[in-house]
């Protein structure tokens, strides 16, 4: 999943600049879920690791191959890798656009015991900022429908139909429940600066038990 320079600038006050996604020991095999432009894969490679990228967008997957990166096109909910085949996983704000528990379970499945995942999510503050502080009515509607979709999902376990249900924000409570159910433990938790008292981003370092 590609992030534009404009998006980085827009959210700069909330991004945890000290959280290093590429922090894995040399020699590790690391999966980057939603590798986007490949920037993170190159950082992982520069640390002496073998990086493998996964991307659902066909154009980004093609560009990654043309750039010489080891990539495949697939969904986060169906990782085409063997169980316990990865030393590390990077997943940078991909989960909000997936079946979140299934994606978390797949991260746990491909990690070897003792392997680590470095993951970030959208918290509720991300969409509250869209809803309450954005001048563009379309983005305010996007914030509102994501908030409503997540409330509905938390109550029923199902999303709203169609485009209304395409995005969820994550909560610490739901994430901790998924982790407990799929053999992951939190090594480090770093909520970002908040908006209206709610975290905009959530950063977790996880270990496979």
Give the residues covered by each predicted segment.
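A short SAM/SAH-binding and catalytic strip from SAM-dependent methyltransferases
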Residues: 88-101
């Amino acid at each position: 999943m590609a992030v534009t320079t404009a998006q980085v600038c827009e959210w700069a006050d909330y991004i945890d600049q000290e959280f290093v996604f590429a922090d894995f020991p040399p020699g590790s095999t690391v999966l980057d879920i939603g590798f986007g432009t490949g920037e993170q894969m190159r950082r992982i490679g520069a640390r002496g690791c073998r990086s493998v990228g996964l991307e659902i967008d066909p154009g980004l997957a093609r560009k990654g191959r043309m750039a010489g990166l080891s990539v495949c096109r697939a969904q986060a909910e169906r990782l085409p890798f063997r169980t316990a085949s990865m030393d590390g996983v990077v997943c940078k704000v991909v989960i909000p656009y997936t079946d979140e528990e299934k994606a978390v379970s797949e991260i746990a499945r491909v990690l070897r015991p003792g392997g680590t995942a470095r993951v970030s999510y959208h918290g509720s503050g991300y969409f509250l900022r869209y809803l309450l502080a954005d001048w563009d009515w379309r983005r305010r509607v996007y914030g509102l429908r994501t908030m409503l979709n997540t409330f509905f999902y938390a109550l029923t376990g199902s999303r709203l139909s169609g485009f209304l249900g395409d995005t969820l924000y994550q909560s610490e409570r739901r994430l901790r429940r998924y982790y407990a159910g799929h053999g992951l433990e939190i090594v480090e938790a770093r909520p970002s600066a908040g908006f209206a008292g709610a975290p905009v981003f959530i950063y977790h370092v996880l270990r496979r038990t």
